[in-house]
Swiss-Prot record:
The active site is at C132. Its main location: cytoplasm. This is Actin maturation protease. Its EC number is 3.4.11.-. The lineage of its organism: Eukaryota, Metazoa, Chordata, Craniata, Vertebrata. It comes from Homo sapiens (Human). The gene is ACTMAP. It comes from the Eukaryota.
Length: 351
């Protein structure tokens, strides 16, 4: 099967970049103010007649109550994000969010199959501007460099210094792999030729073992995959998969008490890997994904993701005329994103 992108099996090590469109330069964002250096402040006048009393001790910090604050990069600069943050309810924990999602979509699942859920817990992070790829990498980094990965600001800084991005955008899967290896210290395997064929089994086995997958795709209005020829190119991270199987292996799985027919691997217990659904079996594989415009997991049909990823060929006309600079590899979106994805594993992992 041929794809419309026909990417090379191995990406070039150092592809030159072509800025699109023309612009002189992008001003660097202002540096945050440095903390006050109290030792540099002038000492108050001293007198034998009026001794200065010692300062009162600071009150103890308030006790932490409720869930930890959500990660929102750019909240201090964006009024829109502030308003959305204030109106939003608490973010559910990973497993609670997945359970909510499965209950919401239970009518989509084939009744002739049993379902096994493999899902690593990912944090959420809301992007600011065209940072979807770096935000997806940050989320993946929490599984690769525990306990909390690396700061998003560092990913942005290194990507900018290496010439991978001008303002947070990432139009090259190969560059994303180089960035992940350098900053997260992980292994990065670039898949080309689409998510079907032999790559399909690689992806599913990767997700079953709990490792993250970075996927470029075209984003619809509800953040789901669509087909816009790359005009809505976006990034997501998947760290979970829902498999429809004829029979659940007897070793290491337990049925969900609230959703009959759904099984989970038992933590801390060896489990027999399930047989992967055959390619071409409709509605048998779903990816659990997150992306930088929502707090929540999303459930996507694997074939829908594969088709969206395989048609990323053109640079968005609206971006080409917005007066900003974007770093695009030689060969454009077709060469940088089409039919490609990134498998990430910890450095010490033999998988």
């Amino acid at each position: 099967m041929t794809s419309p992108c026909s990417p090379p099996l191995k990406p070039p090590i150092s592809p030159p970049k072509t800025p699109v469109p023309q612009a002189s330069s992008i001003p660097s964002p202002p540096l945050p103010p440095s903390p006050l250096d109290f030792s540099a402040l002038p000492s108050p006048p001293w007198s034998q007649q009026t001794p200065v009393p010692p300062p009162l001790p600071l009150p103890p910090p308030p006790a932490a109550t409720g869930p930890a604050p959500r990660h929102v990069f750019g909240l201090e600069k964006s009024q829109l994000l502030k308003e959305a943050f204030d109106k939003a309810g608490p973010v559910p924990k990973g497993r609670e969010d997945v359970k909510r999602l499965l209950k919401l979509h239970k009518d989509r699942f084939r009744g002739d199959l049993r379902w096994i859920l493999f899902c690593a817990d990912l944090p959420s992070l809301i992007q600011e501007g065209p940072q979807c790829g770096l935000v997806a990498l940050w989320m993946a980094g929490t599984l690769l460099s525990p306990p909390s990965g690396v700061p998003l600001e560092r990913l942005i800084r290194v990507a900018t210094e290496r010439g991978y991005t001008a303002q947070g955008e990432m139009f090259s899967v190969a560059d994303m792999g180089r960035l992940a290896q350098e900053v997260l210290g992980c292994q990065a395997k670039l898949l080309s030729g689409g998510l079907g064929g032999p790559n399909r089994d690689l992806v599913l086995q990767h997700l079953v073992t709990g490792h993250p997958l970075l996927i470029p795709y075209d984003e619809d209005f509800n953040h789901e995959p669509c087909q816009r020829k790359g005009h809505k190119a976006h990034w997501a991270v998947s760290a979970g998969v829902l498999l429809g199987v004829r029979a659940v292996p007897s070793l290491g799985y337990t049925e969900d008490p609230e959703l009959p027919g759904l099984f989970h691997p038992v933590l801390g217990t060896p489990c027999q890997p399930p047989s992967l659904p055959e390619e071409g079996s409709p509605g048998a594989v779903y990816l659990l994904s997150k992306q930088g415009k929502s707090w929540h997991y999303q459930l996507w049909d694997y074939d829908q993701v594969r088709e969206s990823n395989l048609q990323l060929t053109d640079f968005s006309p609206s971006r080409a005329t917005d007066g900003r600079v974007y770093v695009v590899p030689v060969g454009g979106v077709r060469a940088g994103l089409c039919g490609q994805a990134l498998l990430l594993t910890p450095q010490d992992c033999s998988h």
